[in-house]
Amino acid sequence: MTLLSPGIELKETTVQSTVVNNSTGTAALAGKFQWGPAFQIKQVTNEVDLVNTFGQPTAETADYFMSAMNFLQYGNDLRVVRAVDRDTAKNSSPIAGNIDYTISTPGSNYAVGDKITVKYVSDDIETEGKITEVDADGKIKKINIPTGKNYAKAKEVGEYPTLGSNWTAEISSSSSGLAAVITLGKIITDSGILLAEIENAEAAMTAVDFQANLKKYGIPGVVALYPGELGDKIEIEIVSKADYAKGASALLPIYPGGGTRASTAKAVFGYGPQTDSQYAIIVRRNDAIVQSVVLSTKRGEKDIYDSNIYIDDFFAKGGSEYIFATAQNWPEGFSGILTLSGGLSSNAEVTAGDLMEAWDFFADRESVDVQLFIAGSCAGESLETASTVQKHVVSIGDARQDCLVLCSPPRETVVGIPVTRAVDNLVNWRTAAGSYTDNNFNISSTYAAIDGNHKYQYDKYNDVNRWVPLAADIAGLCARTDNVSQTWMSPAGYNRGQILNVIKLAIETRQAQRDRLYQEAINPVTGTGGDGYVLYGDKTATSVPSPFDRINVRRLFNMLKTNIGRSSKYRLFELNNAFTRSSFRTETAQYLQGNKALGGIYEYRVVCDTTNNTPSVIDRNEFVATFYIQPARSINYITLNFVATATGADFDELTGLAG
C-alpha cells in the first residue's frame, strides 16, 4: 500500500521464468472390466493396482485388461475408464436372492414370530420363515422367508427363478391368527440397483423402488460399490450395540439365505458401538475381512476419536473400496449378516456407444493430461465396433492436438488368416476397399498411428494363450523411449522397438508385404530369428508427405506445444510491450536450445516482435509468437553402396576428394 507517513516499504517481484518439461508418457485406455468404478478416470501404476481396481481378466475383458497390463510392462502411468451398459449392469445387493411374495390376505390376530413354512407340493422345504411385523389388529405387514433351501429345491426341480403353483406358504400361529394368505412369486435375481457414477450413488440408493424393496425385506441399504459379479463375493456383518455387548454368544441371522452365525465383532474391534444408533460393520470378500468400521445412522454423530461416522457422509467421501450404504430407512437395532448377489458386469451388452462415452472422459486436454491413447484395445470387438470406436478416439486426438492415438486392426482381419490374405485385408480396411466399404479405417491424421499385427500372449490368470492387440505395446514403446532416450526418438527398430511377452505374431510379413502396408501408413510388426519381435515402422496415419508423417516428429511437436503453451499462460493479462515480447522470446529460445543440444532439433527461430505483434494485433489484446523448427528425422531407409576398384586405385581420386 502507499505510505502516508515516513517509513520503509519492502516489495518483492521476479522477472525470471522458464519453460518446464511435462510428462510425455502417460497413457489412456477405456474398456470393459469385471469390476471397478464406471465412467470415471482411475490412475493405475502397476499390475497389482490394475487387478485390485478392475479385477482379473475374463474372456470378455481380456483384450482391455491385457492391453492395460502390457502398457504397464513399459510405463507406469495409465489412466483407465471402465465402460458399462447402464441398462443391464448391476451392483450386488441383499435384495437379490429373496423370494418375492404378496400378502394377498393379511388376516388378523397374528403375532411377530409366528412361523411360516414353505412347501413344495406336500414337502416342507423351509420351516424357519417368520412374521416380522403386524399392525394393531394382528394383520400381517411383513414376513421373512430364508431362501437357501428354497433356492436349492427350485434348482433341483427346474423351477428357478419362478416358483410355480406347487409352491405354497403355510402360517403356524401361536396366537390364534386367522385367514391370512401369502402368495409366493419368484426368487429375485435382479439386485435392483446400479451405481455407475459415485456422484449419483446417493440418489440411486434412496430411490423409491429400491427403498421399498429394502423395507419389504427388513434389511438395511448396503450394496457392492461397483457393478459386476465380483460383488457377489462380498458379505457384510452388521452388529448393533446390544448384540456387540453379547460377544460371540450373539447369533446373527444370515440374509437372505437363512441360518445363523456367531458374531465376530468383539474379536475384530477394540471399541464397538457406543450408542443405539451406532453399528459395527465388518466387510468380508472371499471370506477374508477387508474392512471393519463403526458407523452411525444419526447425522452428526462422532466416534471415540471425534471423527464423523454418519453412514451417508462416510460413504459419500469414498470411505470404502468395497461397499456403499445409506442410513435412510435403516432398520432400528438391526443385526445380521448380508450376503450380496445379483451383480452383473454385462460386458457382452456393452456397445460401441458405451465405449465412446468412456473415451469422451479424455476429451478435455485442460483437465486430463495424457499423451498416448490406447484406442486399439477394442480391436478384439466386431469389425464394426473396432472401426467405429477407434475412429472416434482419433477424432478426440485431432481435437486435443497434444496426443498420439495408437490403433490396431480388427482381430478378424489378421488372426487365423494366411499372410497374403491378411495383408489384403489390412490394406482394404485402411483404404475402404473390397468388403470394407462400410467398416473401415479410411482416415488421415498425424495424431494417430496404426500397427499391422496382433500378438499371441499367455494369460497367467486363466492359464490360456490369447490373441491381444498391439496398440498398448506401441504406446508402451513410446513411454519406454521417453525413459531410456528422448521423446523425439523413434520408438521403432531394434534398439527401442522390442515388444515384450510375445509367443508369436498373427502374421509374419516379408519385405514386399511390408512395403504395401507402409505405403498405407500401417506400421509392420515383425520377428526375425534372434532379434526379437520389433515395431518395424514409425509412420503416423496420414498420406500427406510432411514432417508430421513420422511418430517421433509428431511427439516432438506435441511436447513443444504443451510445454511452451503452458509457459505462455503466464503472459496472460501482462502488457504487450517490448519487454514482455523479449522475455518470452528469450525464455523459449533457451528451452529450444536445450532441445537442440540434445539432438531433437536441427535449427530453430523464435519470432516475437513488432513484425507479428503489429499495432492492430496489440489493439485486439492479442499476443503472437511464431516458432520455426527443423525437427530431427528418424532413419527409415538405409542404402549401402559397395564399389569394387582396381588394385592400386586412388580412393581420394575416385571419391572426388583429391586436390
UniProtKB/Swiss-Prot annotation:
It comes from the Viruses. It holds the Pfam family Phage_sheath_1C. Hexamer. PANTHER family: PHAGE TAIL SHEATH PROTEIN, PTHR35861. Keywords: Viral contractile tail ejection system, Viral genome ejection through host cell envelope, Viral penetration into host cytoplasm, Viral tail protein, Viral tail sheath protein, Virion, Virus entry into host cell. It is found in: Virion. Signal peptide: none annotated. GO terms for biological process: symbiont genome ejection through host cell envelope, contractile tail mechanism. Structural component of the bacteriophage tail which consists of a contractile sheath, a tube and a baseplate. The central cylindrical segment of the tail consists of a rigid tube, composed of multiple copies of gp19, surrounded by the outer contractile sheath assembled from gp18 subunits. A total of 138 copies of gp18 arranged into 23 hexameric rings constitutes the sheath. During infection, contraction of the sheath drives the central tube through the host outer membrane, creating a channel for DNA ejection from the capsid into the host cell. The keyword Plastid does not apply. One of its GO terms (cellular component) is virus tail, sheath. The keyword RNA-binding does not apply. This is Tail sheath protein. Belongs to the myoviridae tail sheath protein family.
